[in-house]
């Protein structure tokens, strides 16, 4: 589900850089749905035209084409790192291999980090940041646990900081 109604200025299509905020997870498994719930919360915000929100659900491989077409990817997901429920993790995709022993992202049909790595084989891997939240429960439930639900505002803050940083770098690069 693409939740961005904005279109870039047609005169700036070549210079516009696409930022994809991709929330993944299964809303039927309580905290596993944190990524999707964050995207729904962000859909109410007024975001820059370069930003696209996407509910990736549990799509796995079908996300590859979308990922290779973006310049900046911010992935929001449930991440099991062994810390206290509600702990927020933030790491770059380049750091993911060294984190793989400590972190497990989601329980989808395929690990989303594997999909991002596979995107390199079919095109390019965008600059990627993963923002994850330690789950309290991934049992069958349509509700997030209180510990995880309370973290959505902070996750959104972190996402917006990433967007601002990327757009500032883009402006500086364009000045050169």
Each language-model region and where it sits:
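Helix-loop-strand module that forms the ligand-binding subsite of alpha/beta enzymes
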Residues: 79-128
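A generic local secondary-structure boundary/capping motif
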Residues: 9-11, 64, 118-120
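SAM-dependent methyltransferases
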Residues: 1-18, 164-176
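Conserved active-site and cofactor/substrate-binding residues in soluble primary-metabolism enzymes
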Residues: 33, 37, 58, 83, ...
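Phosphate-binding/catalytic loops
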Residues: 114-176
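Secondary-structure boundary/capping motif
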Residues: 30-31, 140
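Nucleotide and nucleotide-moiety/phosphate-recognizing core
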Residues: 14-21, 30, 37-86, 90-95
């Amino acid at each position: 589900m693409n939740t961005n109604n904005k279109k870039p200025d047609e005169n700036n299509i070549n210079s516009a850089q696409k930022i994809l905020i991709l929330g993944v997870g299964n809303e039927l498994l309580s905290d596993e749905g944190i990524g999707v719930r964050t995207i729904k919360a962000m859909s109410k915000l007024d975001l820059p035209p370069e930003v696209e929100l996407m509910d990736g659900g549990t799509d796995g491989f079908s996300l590859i084409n979308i990922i290779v077409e973006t310049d900046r990817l911010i992935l929001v997901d449930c991440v099991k790192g062994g810390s206290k429920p509600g702990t927020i993790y933030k790491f770059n995709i380049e750091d993911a291999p060294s984190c793989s022993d400590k972190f497990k992202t989601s329980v989808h049909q395929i690990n989303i980090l594997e999909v991002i790595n596979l995107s390199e084989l079919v095109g390019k891997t965008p600059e990627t940041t993963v923002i994850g939240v330690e789950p309290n429960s991934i049992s069958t439930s349509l509700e997030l646990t209180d510990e995880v639900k309370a973290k959505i505002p902070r996750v959104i803050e972190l996402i917006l900081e990433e967007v601002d940083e990327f757009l500032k770098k883009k402006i500086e690069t364009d000045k050169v």
